Design a protein with these regions (language model features):
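C-terminal scaffold of the Radical SAM
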Residues: 12, 16-39, 47-300
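Short, amphipathic alpha-helical interaction segments positioned at domain boundaries
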Residues: 329-342
């Protein structure tokens, strides 16, 4: 959902804060695209759905009614349906509406409980609105609630990160996504090295405090009750991407939708294709498997890669169990992946 009330200076995702007049036309295109994708792939059942953005809560909840008229017949009681939302725009009425449509997981872009850090990150909600949003989510009937936090900014110290983690204890949520600030290209934060601490110590501390708050780490940035949708990405499962800026992956081919709202409205079903080679698929499996509980299947590695992985097992950097290599320290995932890949 590529609409936002304001554009955050660190965000490189495709979105716009000044094209709300196109929402109606966009949803018509989205409906057409979704219908086309489901029929062309002969989808009979959906295991997970994720409404991301952008900011899905920036759009009137009634716009999702027609979308769910297609999705609902393909869902089961076990289907995980997540909506991303911002604390300032996800009011009780909006939350109740999407809950009645079938949503059962809500993800709030909190980013911080400190007002100065929120302002630095370009967020337009307050600390108080985070608590109110979670309260409203419970009132609407949500039992699976995620918060996003950002750390390793110039504002962060151990003392402040401890306070961030302490706030989690006072909220009844099931999941936390904690992301180290990335200075993405083509954003206002690009190249602003002073904006980021780049501290391994802070990253380790944040992970420790999050786990002490009761959220078990299962991926480098994710803690708590496992998000089935994201787990599917790391497992290399097929998924459809629907909407402007979306990306899909089916049987080794990646599909890219149009990367502007206008272009998508004009050609909603158009996709650029990228066919991944066997070695590229293995590379992704290694990198994603080592940064999560998914692990790396020994049977997908060549002999040299297996030797290097076994060397890491001997040196207690990896664990080996039931035909898979597992990484006990996700912060080292990229270095280990590069070593194994060779």
């Amino acid at each position: 959902m590529p609409f936002c009330e304001s554009k955050c200076p660190y965000c490189a995702f495709g979105s716009s804060d000044d094209e709300f007049k196109k929402v109606g036309a966009y949803f018509k295109a989205l409906f057409f695209d979704l219908n086309f994708q489901l029929k062309s792939q002969n989808i009979k059942e959906i295991s997970t759905i994720f409404f991301g953005g952008g900011t899905p809560s920036a759009v009137n909840a009634k716009f999702y009614d027609e979308i769910f008229s297609i999705l609902a017949p393909l869902c089961t009681p076990k289907t995980e349906i997540t909506f991303e939302a911002n604390p300032n725009s996800a009011n009780l009425a909006w939350l109740k509406h999407i809950k009645n449509l079938g949503a059962n997981r809500i993800s709030f872009g909190a980013q911080s409980f400190f007002e100065d850090k929120l302002k630095f990150l370009g967020r337009i909600h307050s600390r108080e609105q985070i608590f109110k949003a979670v309260e409203n989510a419970h009132a609407a009937g949500f039992k699976n609630i995620n918060l996003d936090l950002i750390y390793d900014t110039k504002f962060d110290t151990k003392k402040r990160l401890l306070a961030e983690a302490e706030n989690l204890k006072s909220l009844v949520i099931t999941h936390l996504s904690a992301y180290s600030l990335t200075l993405e290209e083509n954003t206002p934060f690009a190249g602003k090295k002073s904006y980021k601490k780049d501290s391994d110590t802070l990253a380790k501390f944040m992970i420790e405090q999050t786990q002490r708050a009761g959220f078990r780490q299962y991926e480098i940035s994710n803690f708590g009750q496992i998000c089935k949708h994201n787990l599917g990405y790391w497992q290399g499962k097929n998924y459809l991407g629907v909407g402007a800026f979306s990306v899909g992956f089916v049987n080794g081919t990646r599909y890219y939708a149009k990367s502007s709202i206008d272009a998508y409205i004009t050609q909603p079903t158009h996709r650029e294709r990228e066919i991944l080679s066997p070695s590229e698929l293995v590379r992704e499996h290694i990198f994603l498997g080592l940064r999560s509980i998914v692990g790396v299947e020994a049977g997908r590695l060549n002999e040299d890669q297996k030797k290097r992985a076994n060397l890491l097992v001997e040196n207690e950097k990896l664990l080996f169990k039931n035909g898979k290599f597992y990484n006990p320290n996700f912060l080292l995932s990229d270095e280990i992946a590069l070593f194994i890949e060779g």
